């Protein structure tokens, strides 16, 4: 699964209403008119420019993690990646890819979340560059 880097997010942004209720997928809530506060998508997605950027997913190797083809991901370059986190990384100067980072007992690999794709084992001498940790993913549901 490769990614297309879209660039950093801007500072600031438009504030949207945040309702103080969870949205059920069944019956509507009687609290639909209660606004808790206004927040920006930057605040909700923990965007802290300039080290956070958006990337577009290409492919289906991360569907088991809920990340699908053409989703947008919010990537934080300031975080140190830990075992089990989803990262954007480049292996041996290749194009960046989105995978789950596996680091345990001296084994390091970039793991797909789709059994149709093999994991990429990091071997001695390989050059692994972590471009950032994925904090959020976003998917368009409506028509463009």
Locate each region found by the language model:
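Short, compositionally biased
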Residues: 83-108
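Flexible, small-/acidic-enriched active-site or ligand-binding loops
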Residues: 114-121
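SH3/SH3-like beta-barrel fold
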Residues: 110-112
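Short, positionally conserved secondary-structure boundary motifs
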Residues: 1-63, 96, 103-107, 118, ...
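A short glycine-leucine-enriched loop at secondary-structure breakpoints
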Residues: 64-68
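Structural motif
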Residues: 70-71, 85
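Hydrophobic beta-strand signal
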Residues: 74-75, 88
């Amino acid at each position: 699964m490769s990614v297309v880097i879209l660039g950093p997010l801007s500072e600031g942004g438009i504030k949207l209403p945040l309702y103080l209720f969870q949205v059920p997928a069944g019956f509507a809530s009687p609290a639909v008119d209660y606004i808790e506060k206004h927040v920006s998508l930057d605040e909700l997605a923990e965007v802290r420019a300039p080290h956070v950027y958006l990337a577009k997913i290409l492919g289906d190797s991360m569907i088991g993690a809920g990340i699908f083809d053409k989703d947008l991901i919010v990537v934080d370059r300031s975080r140190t990646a830990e075992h089990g986190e989803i990262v954007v990384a480049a292996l041996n100067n290749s194009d960046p890819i989105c995978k789950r980072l596996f680091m345990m007992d001296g084994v390091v690999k970039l793991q797909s979340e789709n059994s149709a794709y093999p994991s990429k084992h990091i071997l001695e001498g390989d050059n692994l560059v972590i471009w950032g940790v994925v904090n959020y993913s976003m998917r368009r549901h409506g028509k463009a």
